Amino acid sequence: MTDKYENPTSDDYMGVVMGIIMSGGNAKGLAFQAIQQAKAGEFAEAESSLNEASEQLREAHDVQTDLLTRLAQGEKIGWNLYMVHAQDHLMNAITFKDLAVEVVGQEQRLQALENK
């Protein structure tokens, strides 16, 4: 059992929380950037931004999965409002990225129709 997950006030635990928040924020920013790029007709760049967003989300999701696995195995995992906030950031970023994929696709379709 590791202390970094048991004590929700430890620096290690808060580092994990901040990592999830930062990855979620980065992913959401990249997804928004992808939408802006698509609106400008920069579809390769938009795809690249979406791929980077996916990587940020994967990193945060890996930490989340590790925490859930440890909890399922009976380890004591401390929780506080910061962790709840981190999970909220992550889920919002995942949803925003999923919607950004749809918006980029619609923008491609719209621009293709306009260019006919």
Curated annotation (Swiss-Prot):
UniProt keywords, alphabetically: Magnesium, Metal-binding, Phosphoprotein, Phosphotransferase system, Sugar transport, Transferase, Transport
UniProt free text on domains: The PTS EIIA type-3 domain is phosphorylated by phospho-HPr on a histidyl residue. Then, it transfers the phosphoryl group to the PTS EIIB type-3 domain.
SUPFAM superfamilies: Enzyme IIa from lactose specific PTS, IIa-lac (SSF46973)
Cofactor(s) this protein requires: Mg(2+)
Stated name of the protein: PTS system cellobiose-specific EIIA component
Binding site for Mg(2+): 88
UniProt domain PTS EIIA type-3: residue ranges: 11-109
Function text: The phosphoenolpyruvate-dependent sugar phosphotransferase system (sugar PTS), a major carbohydrate active transport system, catalyzes the phosphorylation of incoming sugar substrates concomitantly with their translocation across the cell membrane. Involved in cellobiose transport with PtcB and CelB. This system can also transport lactose.
Subunit structure: Homotrimer.
Lineage, broadest ranks: Bacteria, Bacillati, Bacillota, Bacilli, Lactobacillales
Phenotype caused by lack of the gene: Disruption of the gene abolishes growth on cellobiose and lactose.
Annotated active site: 85 (tele-phosphohistidine intermediate)
Organism name: Lactococcus lactis subsp. lactis (strain IL1403)
Induction remarks: Induced by growth on cellobiose. Negativelly controlled by the CcpA regulator. Also induced in response to galactose.
An example Gene Ontology molecular-function term: metal ion binding
PANTHER family: PTS SYSTEM N,N'-DIACETYLCHITOBIOSE-SPECIFIC EIIA COMPONENT
One Pfam entry name: PTS_IIA
PTM sites of type Phosphohistidine: 85
Manner of cofactor binding, per the entry note: Binds 1 Mg(2+) ion per trimer.
A GO biological-process term: phosphoenolpyruvate-dependent sugar phosphotransferase system
